[in-house]
């Protein structure tokens, strides 16, 4: 009986102490399940328990991989 009371007290008091590390992940670990999305987040799916899967919005622009290196010797013209 003492063990039961001890475990109950531990789980009861640790339940509110959850942080973002223990949040349920969604969208292949890029998103997080929460009740509402932040300003810079976008709703992309629904999680269990009526939660929303929110992903941080990426800024528009060119990726570094898309830019051509001028020193690479690559020319678009023939000859």
Swiss-Prot record:
Keywords from the UniProt entry: Antibiotic, Antimicrobial, Defensin, Disulfide bond, Secreted, Signal
Annotated Gene3D superfamilies: Antimicrobial Peptide, Beta-defensin 2, Chain A (3.10.360.10)
GO biological process: defense response to bacterium; innate immune response
Cystine connections: 26-53, 33-47, 37-54
Gene Ontology CC: membrane; microvesicle; nucleus
Compartment annotation: Secreted
Annotated signal peptide: 1-20
Keyword Cell wall biogenesis/degradation assigned: no
InterPro entries reported in the protein's UniProt record: Beta_defensin_dom (IPR025933)
Pfam families according to UniProt: Defensin_beta_2 (PF13841)
Example of a GO MF term: heparin binding
Domain of life the protein comes from: Eukaryota
Family statement drawn from the similarity comment of this UniProt entry: Belongs to the beta-defensin family.
Biological role: Has antibacterial activity.
Protein name: Beta-defensin 15
The species this protein was found in: Rattus norvegicus (Rat)
């Amino acid at each position: 009986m003492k063990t039961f009371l001890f475990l109950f007290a531990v789980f009861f008091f640790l339940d509110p102490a959850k942080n973002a590390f223990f949040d349920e992940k969604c969208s292949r670990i890029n998103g997080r399940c929460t009740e509402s999305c932040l300003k810079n987040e976008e709703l992309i799916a629904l999680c269990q328990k009526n939660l929303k899967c929110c992903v941080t919005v990426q800024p528009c622009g060119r990726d570094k991989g898309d830019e051509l290196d001028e020193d690479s010797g690559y020319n678009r013209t023939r000859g």
